[in-house]
């Protein structure tokens, strides 16, 4: 197995693990829980998810052609707890992850790490569905 294939498999598995952990955590929370904070200096789950999503969108959009932080990102706005429901929280969460996952679906990235189309198809299916 080529090193590019091994590397991508490890990266994909790690991202899947992090997303699954987040999914399971959010699933256990009530509508009220997503806004709970320990004190005025801490952030709610809603704010943390909003910030993580904003970070993923900023960092993974045009990942190979532009540098990290994008000019259109309003990072300070991510720390305002204005998510109105758990379903909205999930839409924000999924939006960030979709940008990250779509990055791994680009033919250019596939060619950079030297994956065959057959190997990539298998990897892509596991990334999307598991």
Which residues fall in each region the model found?
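Helix-turn-helix
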Residues: 45
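Short, solvent-exposed secondary-structure junction/capping segments
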Residues: 31-34
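A short beta-turn/loop motif at secondary-structure boundaries
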Residues: 39-41, 119-122
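Hydrophobic alpha-helical core bundles mediating ligand binding, dimerization, or RNAP-core interactions
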Residues: 15, 19, 26, 93, ...
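Histidine-centered divalent metal-coordination motifs
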Residues: 51
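Individual transmembrane alpha-helices with interfacial aromatic-anchor signatures
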Residues: 121-130
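Short, helix-capping/interhelical loops that line the mouth of catalytic, cofactor-
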Residues: 1-10, 55-120
């Amino acid at each position: 197995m080529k090193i590019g294939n091994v590397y991508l498999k490890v990266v994909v598995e790690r991202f899947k693990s992090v997303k699954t952990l987040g999914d399971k955590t959010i699933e256990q929370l009530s509508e009220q829980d997503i806004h709970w904070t320990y004190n005025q200096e801490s952030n709610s789950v809603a704010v943390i998810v909003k910030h993580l999503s904003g970070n993923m969108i900023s960092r993974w959009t045009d990942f190979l052609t532009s540098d990290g932080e994008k000019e259109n990102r309003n990072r300070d706005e991510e720390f305002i707890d204005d998510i109105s429901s758990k379903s909205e929280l999930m839409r924000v969460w999924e939006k960030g992850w979709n940008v990250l996952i779509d990055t791994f679906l680009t033919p250019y990235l596939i060619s950079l790490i030297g994956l065959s189309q057959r190997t990539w198809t298998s990897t892509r299916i596991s990334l999307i569905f598991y």
